[in-house]
Structure formats: structure tokens, C-alpha cells
Amino acid sequence: AVTGVSGSCKSTLVHDILFRALEQRITGEHSAKQHLGERVGAFDELTGYESLDAVVLVDQEPIGRTPRSNPVTYIKAFDEIRRIFADVPLARERKYTASTFSFNVKGGRCEKCEGAGYIEVEMVFMADVYVPCEECDGTRYKPPVLDVKYHGRNIVEVLDLTVDQAIRFFPKEEKLGQALWQVQQVGLGYLRLGQPATTLSGGEAQRLKIARELTFSAKSVGKKLYVMDEPTTVLQLEDIRTLAQVLGGLVDPRHSVVLSE
């Protein structure tokens, strides 16, 4: 951990120097900041990175900038939910597939808002705003798709469940449950599955990124260094303890974590 009072250049050291230098050395790629003319912070020597296969920045940047992005799509759990609905007898009878329940492709989505559930309204002197789509009333889908129900709930009602509720609602879905459990473990069990990414705070977005990394870390090959900037922002003491245990789940297999606080 890199600790220090506010203004002591913790973020500069961890992000602008360490992360960007490792990114350049390991992948040979340059961050967007470098493309915009900002250089890697000055340092004398960088050693010990030879055994690393990747460096991952887990920051507080939004997971998406439109209502189309949400927690369940970000952690790649929506594929499982769509598969479950496509297997419902009524869906099979109507020849619906998993893509029918996607709001990112044509089929079952509302075409007026293109599955976003919201319409963007351009404002001249202020930031653009999003208002619920009048065609689908914010549901994202065409009415016939909502006829398909799994244990009494349609796809919209499932997306309105919190992570905690969804874990109880899908007790036999191991793959889906594992992804949702990781979100719960980072203290985000209160988030709704389909909650627009635009409503998430920076701290929530960062912890969601941690949850996704935890979900896929067991499948990944090689050693990673995770760089995090103040992940305990606005967390209560008990939540910090939980987060520390969760980060241990990343370190235990073969990865390392560097964080600033």
C-alpha cells in the first residue's frame, strides 16, 4: 500500500508513474493520456516486472457513460440470465433465443430507444439529459417479450432485482450465482442488476471492476499486477474489512495488488 495525506502525490506515483511505466514495458502500449501528449512520470529505475504478464488499472472511472451499461452486463452475467429466459417453455414455443432478450441487438428490444430505455435529450447550455422512452416506458423491450416469465418474473422484473435478491432468486444457477456473489462480496449487494451505469458513484464503479476481476481471475492465465487508487473511499469500517478479504482473493492465486490510500 502507498499511504499519505491528501496532496502527497500518492496517485501520481501509483498511476502516472508506476502503472503507466509498467503498461509501456509489459504491453508496449501507451495510455490515452500519453497519446494526448502527457508523458510517463519521471523515475530512475524499474525492476522486478519481468515475471508479470499484465498490469490492470482499477480506478473510479465510470463503467459506461450511457444508461445502456449496467452492473449485470459489465460482469458478463446477463448472458446467463438471457439463456435462462430463452429456455422457458413459452420462449421455446415462440422460438425466442437468448438474443431476443438482449437490449443491444434487434429482435426483442424496443427500437425507438434501441434498448436503452431512455432517450437522450440534447441541452444547449447544460449537460444532455436522459428521459424514459415513451414507447416502452423505460422497460427496453417490446411487450411480447415481457410475456415470458421465469418463476413469475419477466426479464424487466429480474433486472430490477438487487444483487442480494437475485442470488436468492437463482439458487440453482451456479455460474450466475458465482458472478453475483463476487459483487455482493465487495459490498454492492444493494445495486439493482439493471441499474444504469450513469447512476453509479466512482467508488461503486471501482468495486464493480474489482468484482469482475475476481470473477475472471481464476480463468486468466499469467500473473497480473492490479493498481488501485483509494478503493476504500466512503466505505464503512466493516466494508473495508470485507474489501480487504476480497483483495486477498486476488493476491492468493498468483496476482499482486498495489493501492494508494
Predicted regions and their residues:
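Conserved phosphate-binding elements of NTP-dependent enzyme cores
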Residues: 1-261
